[in-house]
Structures are given as structure tokens and as C-alpha cells.
Amino acid sequence: MSESITALLPELWVAIGQTFLMLGIGLSAAIVLGGPLGVLLFLLTPGQSLANKPAYLVLSWVVNTVRSFPFIILLVALVPLTRIIAGTSIGPLAAAVPLSVAAIPYFARLVEQSIREVPRGVIEAAHAMGASELQIVWRVLVLEARSGLILALTVLAVSFLSYSAIAGVVGGGGIGDLAIRYGYYRFQTDVMLLTVALLIVLVQICLLYTSDAADDSLRV
């Protein structure tokens, strides 16, 4: 191991922790807010139980608008909001704000697409048996689409792992910040290669874990 990497090990562990912090907050926001938003988008679709075309079009437009923003631009545009929520515009907690804002509509659309795969006959059968709307959402839609939802969460985690690296450009901390400061500005190629290898390992862990979870859900 080169001397530069050995000297950076303490910072490297901190950077990994910051990356997990940003990713954890962003994914939590996506699940808690983006999940229900995706279900609502599906239910507002014409032909569904809460069908409301104007509301669906407005909500869908908002989701598409936020998703269309390049993350680096969204990161800068949300600096005032970040300062209000986090009290600062730098650091992993500050970077978690735009990550969460980007993750919510992204995951919502993935959830909507996953739920659309549920056979319409299953939903109609649940309605015919007198199931409430909440029961249909939880025991039919979510249950039937569970493997698709797990894979959607995988896509989200992998995508936003790269987004967390982008946050390093504006002082967001994490592995990306380490790569920028040492690998790019100081031309330490070994550090750059190490951070790339770490990101690849993290992506592979995400893919391995969630693919196993998806397989298990299909066996239930």
C-alpha cells in the first residue's frame, strides 16, 4: 500500500461513513415519502379507484420536472433550502437535503411502474371481496409488486451512490469529496483509483444483497 493511501486511511473511513450517512438519509426519504407518492400516482391514474386525471397530470408533471434536473444543478439550486433545513450548505447532512429531494420523485416513478405490473384482475378481485383501499394498497399492490419494488430500491441505491459522489464537488463530503480533493486537485492517481474501487465494491454489495432479497420474496 502506498504511503499516500496509508496516510489517508483515517480520512477514508470518515468518507465512507459520510457516504453511508448521505445515502441512508436519501433512501429513507425516498421510501417514506416517495413510496406513498408512487402509490398515489398509480391510484390517480384513469381507471383506478381514486382516478383523477387533472390531479394525476399535475402530480406527474411535478415528478417529471424534478427528475429532469441534472443533479449538480439541483444541488446548487437548493442551497437556500439546504441552509434552512441543515443550517449549512456544506457537509454530508447538507448534501443529504438535495439527495432526498431528488430521490423522492425518482423512487415514486419506479414504485408506480412496479405497481402497474400487478394484474388488474387481482385488484378487481380484492375490491369484489370488500377490501378497503388501505388493505388493497398494502396486501395486494405492495405484496404483489414486492420483487419489483426491491429491484427499484436497488436501482435507486446504485444511482444515488453516484449522486453522493457528485456532492463532493461542492463540499458534500464522502468518497466523492476525497476523490476530488486528493485524486483530482492533487493528482494522486492511486487515491482516485482507490475511491473508484470502493464505489464499485459498494455497488456490487447493493446488487448482491437486493438480488438475494428479490429471490427470497418470490419464494414467499
Tell where the protein language model's regions lie, with residue ranges:
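Transmembrane alpha-helix signature in integral membrane proteins
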Residues: 12-43
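Non-cytoplasmic
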Residues: 81-82, 152-202, 208
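Transmembrane alpha-helices
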Residues: 24, 133-164
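Short helix-to-coil transition segments within interhelical loops
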Residues: 115-145, 185
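Membrane-embedded alpha-helices of multi-pass transport/permease systems
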Residues: 32-37, 93-97, 101-123, 154, ...
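Cytoplasmic-entry segments and transmembrane alpha-helices of multi-pass inner-membrane transporters
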Residues: 40-77, 99, 104, 110-113, ...
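Conserved small/polar residues in nucleotide/adenosyl-binding loops
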Residues: 209-214
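Loop-to-helix entry region at the N-terminal start of transmembrane alpha-helices
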Residues: 14, 18-22, 64-106, 191, ...
